[in-house]
């Protein structure tokens, strides 16, 4: 890394960005998949000049919205619109991240050249892009599917649904919200069959796995502790402000 004449905070940020680039497997990420082509095409039917914006982090690793995918989508859209007799001019750029305002500022000098923006980031990035440029229609090109772990190259498994009330300490590190088809907090339903889920027979019962894990750890007594039902009606868009940054948030 070049670090001469570099602000210390920017140097730290750059260090972690480059470190994350080098992680190709074994990481945690937001996993997404590209929307059906016809859906994307329909969203853009009234626009003739669109900037497709990729994201170089999570969606790039899972091959849904990085620089390569931006090029592929633009080629498909351009060809389809020509066939329909309604050609479209498409720009292409890929930001380091769309969930970081600092990187969204890079579009400031070009965004006015386009009628709309087509984002290939996750749902958080798409919303942040729309917030940064509120006068431009912003359309999603991908569907955000889950927070997952990279089991192997090209193989992602859902592990967390960001419920905001983690119970992994009581369930042996196995998430009942994610792994149980019914999201049960206090033991299995009556349909579990030989350790299999009644809804998905190829899927193990989450509470069978929890029982086996806790038993192996000598902590089976935890399975008898009642976990209160999550009050989903109290859910709202969540914000996390790290200690020491409260004044900055209040000022902003």
Regions found by a protein language model. Name each.
Residues 119-123:
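N-terminal glycine-rich "phosphate-gripper" loop used for MgATP/nucleotide binding
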Residues 91-99:
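Short beta->alpha junction loops
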Residues 125-127:
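Short, well-ordered alpha-helical microsegments
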Residues 1-92, 105-117, 131-170, 174-252:
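Iron-sulfur (Fe-S) cluster-binding modules
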